[in-house]
From Swiss-Prot:
GO terms for molecular function: cellulase activity; cellulose binding. InterPro entries: CBD_sf, Cellulose-bd_dom_fun, GH45_Enzymes, Glyco_hydro_45, RlpA-like_sf. It comes from Fusarium oxysporum. Belongs to the glycosyl hydrolase 45 (cellulase K) family. The keyword Hydrolase applies. It catalyses: Endohydrolysis of (1->4)-beta-D-glucosidic linkages in cellulose, lichenin and cereal beta-D-glucans. Residues 19-308 are annotated as: Catalytic. GO terms for biological process: cellulose catabolic process. GO terms for cellular component: extracellular region. Pfam families: CBM_1, Glyco_hydro_45. The keyword Hydrolase applies. This is Putative endoglucanase type K. Keywords: Carbohydrate metabolism, Cellulose degradation, Glycosidase, Hydrolase, Polysaccharide degradation, Signal. Residues 335-374 form the CBM1 domain.
């Protein structure tokens, strides 16, 4: 059920923030997201997409890679990652009661999980896709290894099918090892921070989009500042989308046509997606029912904390950010830091030298600027 909270604005207009309770599923179909087409909502630019080599595409009319001969796919850095033990960031395909793409494309929502092993944890997601086969207040979370669902753009993007069931994806963390390098981190996230939760329920509220998500998608709603800022802890270990995020920021600005802030929501393109499926799935392709294809350069993506594997069935897709093992200085004098906190560093940056990780975790390089303690 969805409710609305009226927020007073400085101007004459008021914007209602969506909130309520909902259900999640998972997917990763590699398809171009629906919100990557122009004219879906009043935004500065459509969500970014990438070619099969994970390079940002500037042509918002590029054909969906899930269609024959298509060249636009979801960028691998649309993979989820842990901000700290209790908060994660990511992207999703959505269908919100009483809304439409004009109201949810590129909008951000703070989810608080209410069931399963992640009960009590929070995740902020940006909606980059629309689920034509989803029910009301249904969020199809993008996570590599979650299953491709109705559409499969991964086979054409990577030259081979990704492992796992069409709905639900893989069932063990070790299966992530067979995935393309750029998808492994996001795949591991599912079994680590997300604890292999199987389609947990949640409560949600619309919030301002975190810069880290905007840097990846390159898409910001004109009314984003009208919504409340997330009040939870976002500091702990902030593995912001590494180079990929930075790359996307500039890529987003240069690659996508900008819209004026005053532009009203544009009419959405007619959808050409197939019908619903056996499990909550994700829409795939063109306007209205395309899959979220976050456009962000692949290169480097915020690495996800690696935790303990779990088994589960999910709904869709697969992709992820790449990660590089960080070097740890065995002779570092710095005091040890807990899992998911920043580690490594040099004497010039830290008075005590290299920051070592606590027993049971190792220092993993997320990008050229940041390393994080990840459980063994």
């Amino acid at each position: 059920m969805r409710s609305y909270t009226l927020l007073a604005l400085a101007g004459p207009l008021a914007v209602s923030a969506a909130s309520g309770s909902g259900h999640s599923t998972r997917y990763w179909d590699c398809c171009k997201p629906s919100c990557s087409w122009s004219g879906k909502a009043a935004v500065n630019a459509p969500a970014l997409t990438c070619d099969k080599n994970d390079n940002p595409i500037s042509n918002t009319n590029a054909v969906n890679g899930c269609e024959g001969g298509g060249s636009a796919y979801a960028c691998t850095n649309y993979s989820p990652w842990a901000v700290n033990d209790e908060l994660a960031y990511g992207f999703a395909a959505t269908k919100i009661s009483g809304g439409s793409e004009a109201s949810w494309c590129c909008a951000c929502y703070a989810l608080t999980f209410t069931t399963g092993p992640v009960k009590g944890k929070k995740m902020i997601v940006q909606s980059t896709n629309t689920g034509g086969d989803l029910g009301d207040n249904h969020f199809d979370l993008m996570m590599p290894g979650g299953g491709v669902g109705i559409f499969d753009g991964c086979t054409s993007e990577f030259g081979k099918a990704l492992g796992g069931a069409q709905y639900g994806g893989i069932s063990s963390r070790s299966e992530c090892d067979s995935y393309p390098e750029l998808l492994k981190d996001g795949c591991h996230w599912r079994f680590d921070w997300f604890e292999n939760a199987d389609n947990p329920d949640f409560t949600f509220e619309q919030v301002q989009c975190p810069k880290a998500l905007l840097d990846i998608s390159g898409c910001k709603r004109d009314d984003d500042s009208s919504f409340p800022a997330f009040k939870g802890d976002t500091s702990a270990s902030k593995p912001q989308p590494s180079s990929s995020a930075k790359k996307t920021t500039s890529a987003a600005a240069a690659a996508q046509p900008q819209k004026t802030k005053d532009s009203a929501p544009v009419v959405q393109k007619s959808s050409t997606k197939p019908a619903a499926q056996p499990e909550p799935t994700k829409p795939a392709d063109k306007p209205q029912t395309d899959k979220p294809v976050a456009t962000k350069p692949a290169a480097t993506k915020p690495a996800q904390p690696v935790n303990k594997p779990k088994t589960t069935q999910k709904v869709r897709g697969t992709k992820t950010r790449g990660s590089c093992p960080a070097k740890t200085d065995a002779t570092a004098k710095a005091s040890v830091v807990p899992a998911y906190y920043q580690c490594g560093g040099s004497k010039s940056a830290y008075p005590n030298g290299n920051l070592a990780c606590a027993t049971g975790s190792k220092c993993v390089k997320q990008n050229e600027y940041y390393s994080q303690c990840v459980p063994n």
